[in-house]
Amino acid sequence: MVNLHIFHSVSARELLEEVDIPLEVSGLGVYFHVYQDADRPFYIGISDDMAGRNRDHLENYRKKNYWMVKNPHRLTDLRCFVDDDFYSTYDFYAPGRDAVCGEWEQAVDRLFDHMTILFGKVTLLKDGVPVQQSLEEARRTVGQVERQLQDNMVLRLNLDPSWIGRTGSNRGGGLDDVAHRLSLTYADSVSVRLDERIWL
């Protein structure tokens, strides 16, 4: 059993301005990018320094290093990533390409205005008791959980597997393909709730 505890949330703007960021956010864990009040993330990532990694993400959007969806509101239901006859790169600005009349910058501003980042801590449990892990073992478990979440979203939402790269992410978990029994909990201060049916 693995528990994923969402312990903090922050808006993209607040993270850039470093407003009330707890020290724990700079540690190892899984994080999620959510648009507006969506119940599913458009990005899942892991890092040893989640706060620093997410600031890098936001700067990469500004610098045109990532694919950028032309209409960020489509990140609410992820329809722009569904694997069907309508799936197309035309829904995105490609990395490094200039958009017409500042459209890229407008899309990034809209994204940042409505983007929430959730920070989660992964704990391996045995009979309900946390298992002590080395840093290397903990990183491996976190990577396995990231990959499992990504795979479940692809399967249950019929997403094109390339959606992971479209949002700046790497393939989670290396070569590991381990299915953990997952539980999802939240701190009282976190108001965003994700749809567990797409993962668990």
What are these regions, as identified by a protein language model?
Residues 1-42, 48-200:
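Boundary/linker segments flanking structured domains
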